[in-house]
Every structure is written in structure tokens, then in C-alpha cells.
Amino acid sequence: MSDQSFDAPVWHNGKALRKGYTTGSCATAAAKVAALMVLRQHLIHQVSIVTPSGVTLCLNVESPHIEGRQAIAAIRKDGGDDVDATHGMLIFARVTLNDSGEITLQGGEGVGTVTRKGIGLPVGSAAINRTPRHTIESVVREAIGPARGADIEIFAPEGEERAQKTYNARLGILGGISIIGTTGIVTPMSEESWKRSLSLELEIKRAAGLERVVLVPGNHGERFVREQMGIDTQVVVTMSNFVGYMIEEAVRLGYRHIVLIGHPGKLIKIAAGIFHTHSHIADARMETLVAHLALLGAPLELLTRVSDCDTTEAAMEHIEAYGFQHIYNHLAQRICMRVMQMLRFTKTPPTCDAIMFSFDNQILGSNRPIEEIVEEMQC
């Protein structure tokens, strides 16, 4: 990525969105300027780094301080127009020179601690991902030369509070934020970043020994599983709209049993072979309902009424009025069939089940008896 491409906006829904930079870039820049300040013994107010994607960032330095062989500096996180929980916070680095020739890196206040396997970092270590670790150590080594040593501490005073608005606790990262970023650049509305964060939860649960997983579109699905089905939320992972991607990730990681649970408004699309359920990709909810109602012998009047509906909930009212609620079991079976078709080239595909529920938390249908599915998920 060139500097010009960094300055160029990302267009989304007709709006120009500004790119930003990651906590990893902030920590790298803060560590570099702290190392330079302790060597030169004077304050520096601007620093440049080259991100892993090749973009050069020129960043303002805040709170610079030198005390003997130690210096502290901070960089303010700017997520561009992809405002997240860490946007606007200060990421600090403290660099202390020594004569060991070695560089050490640790997390301080506000940087989370890894408590579970599965994210590529040792349990007990600071949540500073591999790419930022490399860039932080590299810029400090370049600054101090081959003979000197340095102890680096990355800290973020607001980190513990900000982390409560992130997925960190679910990923087993406690006490603060993560220092992350494989490219160093934040791209607004980045689907790949979102998908990767969801997949990471699958990896952590698999590393903990989980072989069965419930995939839900969002918070409503998770609540339903916990409150109405009595299934431990430890087996629940959000898939958002990325149904196909998350199923493939679960297969890659070796899960043996996948259960899809959600409202028909999302899951119906899977019955039509649509594995990315965002409306900007595809809809076909009413068409799918009409087709399967017709297969079940529904009268033309019901088909017409459903076809004219704008929402799944409205269609469901007509389906209930005509006594065709058994369509949900039929659709759940169709969903599982579609999943197995998608995985037809997989050597050992997992078992797949599907359950649909209404907005008022009533179970509408499933591909096989609910009791069997729940019992297996509790094993």
C-alpha cells in the first residue's frame, strides 16, 4: 500500500471514509521515539514509521518525558472513520536502556493479559500480537544499534476501561486492550478484519477442547440459546452475516458438530444457498418462503400474501394463519442439506443442525427433535 493509497478514502455506500492506524502502529511509533529520545537526551514531538503494509506514517508525539536512561512517549490512536473502542486513546511506550544487548518487551497498565490458548500468544503473556511485537522490537533495535539492550513497556492508562467495549474478555484477554494490527492500517468497514475477529473466537474455543459449536447471527441468538434452550454460552460463537465463512472455519479447525440457530429472517437465506446473509449481497427471503410453501402444497392465496410481504415477521403471520407452521422444520432440513452440499468435498464433514426461533423467543422449527440437539450440545 502506497502513501497515496493511504490518503485515498474508502468509499462505502456513497460516502468517503478516512483510513486510520492500529494500536500496533501507535505502540511501534511510541517505542521508536522513546528510544530516540533517551539516546539523544532531548524531546521529540513528531516521529515517522513504516507500517507492515509499506505506508509511512508521520505521527505527533504526546507526553514526551526523559529521565536518565529512560524515556516515555505516547501516540494517540486514530481509527479514521472506523471508530472503535480504542479510538482517541493514548498508547504509551517506556524504553529503558541497558548494557545487556538484549531487547525485552512487556505489557503494562491497560494492556490485556492472555489467559487462554488459541490466539497465537503464550498464556500469561501481554496481548501484544506477533506483528506489533516484531515492529516494536525492530524499530527500537534500529534506534539503539546492535550493542545496547533495552526494556520496552507498552501501556495504556485507559485500556482496562476501554477493553470492556471489546470482545477481549470473550477471547480470554483480561485487564486491558490488545496491541494489534497485521498491516498497521485501519480500513473503514473492513469485512476481512471483522471476519477474522469472529474466527478467532472459534480458534480459542477449539484450543480449549471444544468440538461442538453453536453459530448465531448476533446477540439475540446468544440470549435465546442461553435463556430458552439452557445451552452453555461457552459453545456459542457469533457468525454475523458470514455463515459460509464461519462454517468453513469451523471445519478447518476440526469441529465435529455445528448448530445454526437464528431467526428465519437470516436463516431462510441459507435454505436458498445464500451463505452471506447481508441484504446488500442477496435477499430472496419471500421467494424462498413461497417456493417451499408451494412444495408443501400451500394455496395460491397464501403464496400471494407471502410474496407481497416486506418483512419475514409479516410473512410468518400469514403462515400461522393458514396453519403452515411445519414449513420451519422443512426449511431447517433444507438448511442442513445446503450446508452439506457446500461441504461435499470435505473428507470428514461435521454434523449439522438448524433451529429457528421467533422474535418473541418461541422455537419455530428444527431439522430433528430439539431435545436430541440440546442433549448432544451438553455432552
Curated annotation (Swiss-Prot):
UniProt EC number: 2.1.1.195
Pfam families found in the cross-reference section: CbiD
Entry keyword Repeat: no
Keywords on record: Cobalamin biosynthesis, Methyltransferase, S-adenosyl-L-methionine, Transferase
UniProt cross-references to Gene3D superfamilies, sorted A to Z: CbiD-like
Source organism superkingdom: Bacteria
UniProt record, GO biological process: anaerobic cobalamin biosynthetic process; methylation
SUPFAM superfamilies to which the protein is assigned, alphabetical: CbiD-like
MF terms in GO: cobalt-precorrin-5B C1-methyltransferase activity
Catalytic activity: Co-precorrin-5B + S-adenosyl-L-methionine = Co-precorrin-6A + S-adenosyl-L-homocysteine
Top-level EC class: transferase
Pathway(s): Cofactor biosynthesis; adenosylcobalamin biosynthesis; cob(II)yrinate a,c-diamide from sirohydrochlorin (anaerobic route): step 6/10
Family membership noted in the UniProt record: Belongs to the CbiD family.
Protein name, per record: Cobalt-precorrin-5B C(1)-methyltransferase
Highest classification ranks of the organism: Bacteria, Pseudomonadati, Pseudomonadota, Gammaproteobacteria, Enterobacterales
